[in-house]
Amino acid sequence: VYAVSAYAPITNLDAADMAYEWSYKGITSFNKVTMGQGELPQANVGGNTAPPQRTMQRVNLNADDVAYSNSLSEHFPEYVNNLQLHDSMGRVLKLDKNGNGTFKNYVKAFIIDAANKAQAKGTDLSKHTYLVRDNKTGTIKDINWEAYNRFVSRSKAPGAFDSRSNDSGENNLFGTSTTDNNHFTITAALHDTTPNQDVYVENAKIVTMMNPMNYLGSPAATNARYYRIRYGTADSNTSVAIPLIVGARAQNLGYNVDMATPFDVDHSGDYDLDELFNWMDNIV
């Protein structure tokens, strides 16, 4: 593989549940978008397809969900610190036990940069009350992290990827010819809420193969040298930390990484094709 273009990547699944709660811990009520399992797009009169019908469900977390969220988020700093990532200036990206530190500032810097670029283009930012402005210049100098995550809001319950009820799309991803859905983390298996007493964690080799973090820098792998990663600031399908972790690892290895968090963009892709094509032209 010569180059990678990734829009809103759902990846690093082993750590994604922890990262999600690092972002959304404390948000106990949210809207969950649902659609019928196996539902196909509906054709319209013109012959084109329309997206599947989706419904909005209001979800309120119970005390057990909140406790699970807290537990997951508490383990995220250890994961981040063990990665030993650093930014472009060589600063080590770390978190303390409360989830604060240079890594959090690193993530915030991408959102701040995106907001300033949007403002420079004339975008009305008045609804984004989590933004902190410089009183003299009017530029965005910081964000209120908790307020930002409340604004975006979670769209998944704790155990966002390895669901405790073993029914997420990612659980299905790790299914086998005999079992539709499987857990892929020990944590979710230990906290499984289904009546099934034979809780099965999918083969560790398969879980490893699904995570690019296990191959970036591995002598057993040949890595792409060019990466373009985009994850919108309004996207809650994973934590914004996840794609930035992958990009930082690639950058630390000396690869060419173009990484950004387009402002107020939800879970989508191909929204900046001119920029994408220019990037492609410049790396060949």
Task: Enumerate the language-model features and the residues they cover.
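Primarily recognizes the serine-hydrolase "nucleophile elbow" in alpha/beta-hydrolase
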Residues: V1-I27, V207
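Hydrophobic transmembrane alpha-helix bundles
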Residues: V1-L13, L40, M259-S268
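Generic detector of intrinsically disordered, low-complexity, polar/charged segments
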Residues: A6, V33-M35, A43-N44, D87, ...
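Detector for methionine-enriched segments
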Residues: M18, M35, M56, M89, ...
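Active-site-adjacent alpha-helix of alpha/beta-hydrolase-fold enzymes
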Residues: Y20-N82, T222, G232-N256
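Ubiquitin-like/PB1-type beta-grasp interaction modules and other compact soluble beta-rich domains
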Residues: S69-S71, H75-F103, I111
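C-terminal subdomain of alpha/beta-hydrolase-fold enzymes, centered on the catalytic histidine
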Residues: G101-V284
